[in-house]
Amino acid sequence: MATEKTHQFHPSLHFVLFPFMAQGHMIPMIDIARLLAQRGVTITIVTTPHNAARFKNVLNRAIESGLAINILHVKFPYQEFGLPEGKENIDSLDSTELMVPFFKAVNLLEDPVMKLMEEMKPRPSCLISDWCLPYTSIIAKNFNIPKIVFHGMGCFNLLCMHVLRRNLEILENVKSDEEYFLVPSFPDRVEFTKLQLPVKANASGDWKEIMDEMVKAEYTSYGVIVNTFQELEPPYVKDYKEAMDGKVWSIGPVSLCNKAGADKAERGSKAAIDQDECLQWLDSKEEGSVLYVCLGSICNLPLSQLKELGLGLEESRRSFIWVIRGSEKYKELFEWMLESGFEERIKERGLLIKGWAPQVLILSHPSVGGFLTHCGWNSTLEGITSGIPLITWPLFGDQFCNQKLVVQVLKAGVSAGVEEVMKWGEEDKIGVLVDKEGVKKAVEELMGDSDDAKERRRRVKELGELAHKAVEKGGSSHSNITLLLQDIMQLAQFKN
């Protein structure tokens, strides 16, 4: 097998990576592991057995190609907080009531990880930890090594949260959850409701304790790496870097480290569709004619809304791929598709993927001309990197923030019209936010031939080209990885 190494940087560096147990956090962290290993860094990834199994194939190929990547397992402490066995990932949790126990259980990994670190050889030079794992700060301090935080968000989001944490009185003065307020001292004029914010800036109870630990761990870390590129959001990269005293390295889009078809197809998990079958279907369609529809690995839309989405796609008369997470929750949807004749009616121009989809593989195909997305940061960046304009359908978390960046700032997408956060446990009460006519209208606005649609396609194609240049030798993200390694190398030499 051909080697993945681009060139040796310094073989004595050893980075230990701690991905958070959520698909959207793990996927880019595995890409980061490969990017650093390609520079000659020894990598150790610490995670639980169930989570390690999700990226086993991709990492095995990387290791076979000559990259120095090791995986160490720690047992997940289910029993201490009453979690069912096997619930090692956010997407496996059945209710929001399990979220706080899950985060508390995660922090109990501190002691077993401390023991692993004591036995680790060569001695680690640096930790890269997901923001959601604040216990790693204690470990870094104990071993006197730098800890770098990885968020899984872009700089637009990170700067927004930084500004609001320092202006909490703004949130206190907002009279209701529906009232919009202006983010102060921001490069662009952007408004949000409190519920649309990436994380609760003014959380209470157990969540406040958890959030406070995360924020403290972030601000006491050595620096931050971000899956973005400078050319995508220049004023936000600049201002966030200043806010963090310069120790911010934008190294994305990290998904571009997946060059082989197999790596693209199995990124995150094994796909629910055969790679060749998927590509043959796409090959049969005209360039730019297919809308790719995927609302993420934790989509909580109610059945009534999913039906309207399906009917809107049908009435758009456009070819589409619709990814529907294969779980018990969607059994009723699959039954409706069969019983109503939906699946039969759309079979010539619609491809349904029930489960995990090879997203990067699909988005990079020339037949795809639009992406209806929940605006998770990975999906947002992967769409832009592929030069694909977006229909934004945010659900919760950082997704409304990403929508503002895409639609208002970058002008690389159109909104489906969702303003309300899809609260866990209240989905059916919220009901339908976008009916089939709204879906059809958004698809036409994005995929049609209006001057606005053509300009949008031009802009996002340009951004996609800039993304690829950023990761090439001499590009901004490639150079930032070099600067990061030089920084850690100097620290290591100073300590020795």
Curated annotation (Swiss-Prot):
EC number: 2.4.1.-
A Pfam short name: UDPGT
Signal peptide (UniProt feature, chain positions): none
Superkingdom to which the source organism belongs: Eukaryota
Record's keyword annotation contains Glycosyltransferase: yes
Keyword vocabulary terms for this entry: Glycosyltransferase, Transferase
Top-level EC class as recorded in UniProt: transferase
Residues that, per the record, bind UDP-alpha-D-glucose: 297, 357-359, 374-382, 396-399
Disulfides per UniProt: none
Family: Belongs to the UDP-glycosyltransferase family.
Name of protein: UDP-glycosyltransferase 73C3
Name of the gene encoding the protein in the UniProt record: UGT73C3
